[in-house]
């Protein structure tokens, strides 16, 4: 309630303002630049959306484009240091002053002083650098200026990860890589990638060549990511995966910043090198043993087998909040043959060939204060195996950081098992996770 004293004071103020705005006090000459006019524009505003390689407007089917969530966008007066051409440790640092991370729909907005700058857009080892002149007002960047590159061309400011792919027999991950522009691979063919890989991709096979890769740490160091998709037989490298010298190479590669992508029946590669983080649930024995995250030595008391039975998970769910928000904004082909908006809380995950009974935190060492540091595996997608006791809402896609700066991604499902146009939800999730496993590492233990 207002008092009468307050009313008198209010009227007095109104009277004083009326006098101040009269003809004797020219507070507004009618130009609109006075206290009631719009504030002057003093900054340059930069807007846009970051897109996945080869999946921007004009590249993907209308409405089925793939944005990049969590990409770093910033400006600098100097060109950034080049991304190393091989494996390296990228520890997390604060976001550059004035930099932003893109939203779930890939959008960003920067407000800076007008001038000429380097504009850097980066997600993991995907990076585009370009000079840009910014003047007062808003500049909206077109997709061709904000789409992550699918080639390694540092002299032109274009970077993408160097990858090795061990060619699977049932999971043609190279088709997904082809759809995001790796090499000249025909993304819809589900055919042999030989001759299509390009300089950014090196192909191996499980029969004999993969063994030489795993036995040569210097060859492994050439690649930021090594893909080990499902193979019906691991006999070509089974002996090597029981050899602690080879397993030490895998541990050393990850420790130095390397990323491993492993799916279903190829799980022995990760399970034998790092036995503790994931316990597989199907009939094959789970690996048991030890490993030292700093010396890379280890033991295997039980040599595991990741082979399991086929099932479809009708209740797939993106359990990471950022992944959930990102997937929920997208539209694309469905497993039933239609096209529609994805529900990140209920989608079908097909061609699972094992299930994860549980994940375990693993102590890696201590920090500078002497406190223990644990590797806590992270589930990105969950789902159920029908008819299997205890296999409800279990992790289907997991990442963990078992040593140093690197990461391991394991999925129970195959990603590409038949030719088709476009990208299904689990294939889009793969693209998201390829981006995520390249990001920096917090508090690595060496």
Identify the role of each PLM range.
Residues 302-419:
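Catalytic beta-strand/loop cores that center a nucleophilic Ser/Cys/Thr
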Residues 109-142, 147:
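A short, solvent-exposed loop/turn motif at the edges and junctions
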Residues 233-352:
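A glycine-rich, often tryptophan-bearing local segment used as a flexible ligand/cofactor-contacting loop or short
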Residues 15-54, 129, 141, 145, ...:
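Bacterial Sec-dependent N-terminal signal peptides
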Residues 49-68:
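Structural motif
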Residues 77-107, 111:
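Short, acidic Ser/Thr/Gly-rich low-complexity loop/linker segments typical of extracellular
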Residues 30-31, 171, 271-272, 278-290, ...:
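Extracellular ligand-binding/catalytic regions of CAZymes and related secreted enzymes
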Residues 164-278:
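Helical hinge/lid and interdomain linker segments adjacent to catalytic or ligand-binding clefts
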